[in-house]
Amino acid sequence: MIKKRIAPLVLGLWALLFLFTFPAIAEDDPEDGKSTNDSGPLTFEGFLEMENLFNAHKDQSFDDAVIKNEIRGKFKIRYGTDNAHVFLSPDLYLSSAVFQSESDKTCAYNDDFDVARNMRISDRGYEASLSEGYVHYGNSRARVRVGNQIYGWGTADVFNPTSYFNPYDMRETFFKDDDELKLGVPSISGMAFFEKFTVEMVIVPVHIPGILAEDGRYWEIHLDNYQLPIVFDDVHALSGGIENSAFGARVSSTILGTDVSVSAYHGPDKDFVYLPSRILVEPGEPVSVLVTPKTYPVSFLGMDFSKSLDSFVFQAELAYSPDKRTTLAQNPDSGEPIVFPYTVERSDYIAYAVGFNYFIPMHEWIEGHEGDTVLTMEWYQTRFLNRSRTEPVITDFISARFEDSYFKGRVPVACTCLVSLKNPGYVIWPRIGYDFQNGFSTTLSYLHLDGRSEALNTTESLFYYFRNNDSLIWKLHYDF
């Protein structure tokens, strides 16, 4: 009941911010007295999208194959000038879970009504989120933003080791649109523009944890190669306080034609430590192990590079932490008793991603071909440098993506492949679309996932646990 009362209050506060705070700062640039905005004080754009997801597993009825029917509306609203404005980018979702029984959680956004710290309001069948919603004030020398923000730190296309602030929405693992994967964080950011470099500083006063697929969801992870069932506990945000705030800085420059950035961060780790906490013994349920997603503070130093060379754009990111937490490894097959909860220790840690974009000159081979043909490839690896630590699950990935369009841009095609080498598994994701060039477009894609388990009581590739989740996805999209 309290949270249901908070929701209108949150929306009301944003309305007051929009109506009253903005006029106080929406002045023309004090340096020259002229606005640089030629499109008027209010701009509004966005899209509406219908998404339908079907499980492609054989030997099931059509009703069982239908997993999700969802309507999404995304809006981008800006009021003000280039120098001083309010920017809002809300996402509104409505899914078929509204009409399903409470016992069917396959595509539910949340078990119950909830208001998150970043103003994401969700229930079983609907969700409203504000990934970006901030007040902007600046000029040619500097700018300041206050509100929900997403930070595009890093240069890699798939995995970004130096993107520290924005946690991931993993309710559909990687199989969401790019603009849905990162959660906005309430923060204050400032950027100063110097002649040869740019400095950005960020403060996030409250912790925003990532989101995982909960029990009963289509993309829930079933660790079915363990002798005892694994049950995941709920995710909890860290308490308020300066000790759980995040701070970061980034210096960017161009040196000899290469874009270079150096960054530093201290605050809550956006990656969870999956801590085996205790044995669960409940009446009528099998004995199982409770795993709790925990968040700990972490420090990072990072660098990223981007270099254009003929038809190639090369990218690299590197992040190092002296104090990233993980659990001490225990071997269930050693014959020694397992001690719960597992011990959590600090460790030196390194993560890097290297890759390139190749703009293929397809017009040289296909007469009249228009548009960009791009091949993107990337290698991603993480390591704990101290021995006896539990090894990272998301590591040793090769990704490849091919994108092109035909018939004057009406038919876009793409194929993405992500391969896990350390824990064998892969996903292949071909897509084809048609652009009616009147605002409407449609896409059809297929997800094929597979992997293998090499031993009991070991964590395998994510794709192994989703081996029965081959899916067909159809979308109808309208831009306005």
Each predicted region: which residue ranges?
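Transmembrane beta-strand segments of Gram-negative outer membrane beta-barrel proteins
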Residues: 34-61, 67, 84-88
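Residues on the lipid-exposed face of transmembrane beta-strands in outer-membrane beta-barrel proteins
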Residues: 50, 73-79, 132-137, 188-192, ...
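Transmembrane beta-strands of outer-membrane beta-barrel pores
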Residues: 50-56, 81-83, 92-96, 139-141, ...
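Residues that define the transmembrane beta-barrel architecture of outer-membrane proteins
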Residues: 54, 65-71, 126-131, 140, ...
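Outer membrane beta-barrel
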Residues: 80-220, 447-453
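Repeated loop/turn-to-beta-strand initiation elements of outer-membrane beta-barrel proteins
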Residues: 83-86, 141-144, 196-199, 257-260, ...
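Outer-membrane beta-barrel "beta-signal"
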Residues: 170, 356, 466-480
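Detector for outer-membrane/organellar transmembrane beta-barrel domains
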Residues: 265-267, 311-328, 332-419
